[in-house]
């Protein structure tokens, strides 16, 4: 943060023209520094990326198989992304004149977590804390000109949910038939299919009322 907690409080008082923060509040902020909401919003984001493959065959048949798994946490709390890919290619010389092949690709990706209102969080009341004195989530809106009536900014990423799933299938086949030494008949066909599923939930703690949504798209 550019300002200390006490400096922020004095700036709010100056802007509002009233003592939004009392002298006691400012004294406490001098000691504690206040809540740095960035420490709660942001985190280290480890990821893993694993690739495996195999290939081989014989004089008449060859194959290639591969798989990829990617997982990553978001730099914002309660967000993550994952993806899994599988690929299989097979070619076969069935006779002196006929060669066929199949290529398949399957993928699923999943994105979890709601968008966090970082701008609101950075300007929220630094004298407040994520938890109240009883250890429960601090869910009381602040109307002092600091929180602008918005709920505690960590409630949305914690209690709201959003899940976006994308499934993709790409498949193709081909056949080559040698009609003559100088003429080859090539036949191919392919299929591509994408399914999208978007679901979400908004908690009453954040929006006053609960709401759930599910949308499918192909």
Language model feature labels by segment:
Residues 1-34, 74-81, 85-170, 186-218:
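Surface-exposed loop/interface segments of Gram-negative outer-membrane beta-barrel transport/assembly proteins
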């Amino acid at each position: 943060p550019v300002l200390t907690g006490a400096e922020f409080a004095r700036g709010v008082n100056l802007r509002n023209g009233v003592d939004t923060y009392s002298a006691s509040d400012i004294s406490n902020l001098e000691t504690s520094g206040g809540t740095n909401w960035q420490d709660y919003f942001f985190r280290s984001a480890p990821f893993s990326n694993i690739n495996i493959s195999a290939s081989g065959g014989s004089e008449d048949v060859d194959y290639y198989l591969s798989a990829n798994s990617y997982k990553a946490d978001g730099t914002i709390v309660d967000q993550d992304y994952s993806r899994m890919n599988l690929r299989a290619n097979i070619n076969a010389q069935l006779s002196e004149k006929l060669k066929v092949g199949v290529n398949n690709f399957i993928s699923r990706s999943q994105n979890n977590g709601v968008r966090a209102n970082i701008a609101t969080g950075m300007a929220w009341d630094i004298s407040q804390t994520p938890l109240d004195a009883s250890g429960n989530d601090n869910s009381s809106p602040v109307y002092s000109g600091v929180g602008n009536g918005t709920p505690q900014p960590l409630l949305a990423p914690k209690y709201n949910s959003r899940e976006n799933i994308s499934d993709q299938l790409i498949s193709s086949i081909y056949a080559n038939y040698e009609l003559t030494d100088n003429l080859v008949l090539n036949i191919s066909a392919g299929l591509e299919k994408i399914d999208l599923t978007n679901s979400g939930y908004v908690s009453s703690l954040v929006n006053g009322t609960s709401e759930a949504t599910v949308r499918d798209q192909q």
